């Protein structure tokens, strides 16, 4: 006698907490589970990709800070980095900046009274190698899914919009 095959429709939604899915918008719990999975996978990817690019021992935030400092080849302040990366705890970005400085990937400067960070040649080269590894390992597999670049951009826009809703809900929860 063979066992009946299970399908996702017979099992229900894929969530991490059924008690959260038992509400007005169960799909939100599915989304949150997916966000948790992709968040952790993306952080692992950044760390491993940068290590493969020749710069081991960086955290995911270190990698993000380095990429943003290299972005558009303009010096950035800690406040700029915190705003763009949506990091509330300034000390985390400050620590990442010091670590990247000690590795020679960024250099400190000044804009008026504010400290700035600019990419060094070593930092730009590390980001270039990261891009090469990304193009070799990640880009082809994502392209092979058949998801169009337009659809990926659409998903990115939805995620950015949802981040605003989560931020507003966090502010409301903090005032309770």
List the model feature ranges, each with a label.
Residues 1-24, 148-176:
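C-terminal regulatory/oligomerization modules of transcriptional regulators
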Residues 1-56:
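N-terminal leader segment of winged-helix/HTH proteins
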Residues 34, 45, 64-67, 125:
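Pre-recognition alpha-helix immediately N-terminal to the DNA-recognition helix
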Residues 42, 129-145, 158, 162-170:
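Alpha-helical linker/hinge and terminal dimerization helices associated
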Residues 47-88:
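N-terminal helix-turn-helix DNA-binding core of bacterial DNA-binding proteins
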Residues 66, 81, 96-103:
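Basic amphipathic alpha-helical segments that dock to polyanions
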Residues 92-93:
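Helix-turn-helix DNA-binding helix
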Residues 98-153:
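Charged, amphipathic alpha-helical coiled-coil/dimerization segments
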């Amino acid at each position: 006698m063979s066992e009946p095959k299970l399908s996702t429709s017979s099992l229900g939604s894929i969530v991490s907490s059924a008690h959260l899915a038992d509400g007005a918008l169960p799909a939100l719990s599915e989304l949150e589970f997916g966000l948790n999975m992709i968040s952790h996978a993306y952080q692992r990817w950044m760390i491993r990709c940068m290590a493969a690019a020749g710069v081991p021992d960086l955290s995911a935030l270190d990698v993000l800070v380095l990429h943003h400092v290299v972005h558009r080849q303009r010096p950035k302040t800690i406040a700029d980095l915190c705003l763009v990366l949506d990091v509330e705890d300034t000390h985390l970005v400050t620590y990442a900046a010091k670590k990247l400085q000690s590795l020679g990937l960024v250099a400190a400067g000044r804009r008026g009274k504010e400290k700035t960070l600019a990419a060094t040649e070593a930092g730009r080269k590390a980001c270039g190698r990261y891009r090469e590894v990304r193009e070799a390992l990640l880009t082809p597999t994502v392209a092979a899914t058949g998801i169009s670049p337009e659809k990926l951009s659409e998903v990115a826009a939805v995620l950015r919009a949802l981040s605003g809703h989560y931020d507003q809900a966090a502010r409301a929860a903090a005032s309770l």
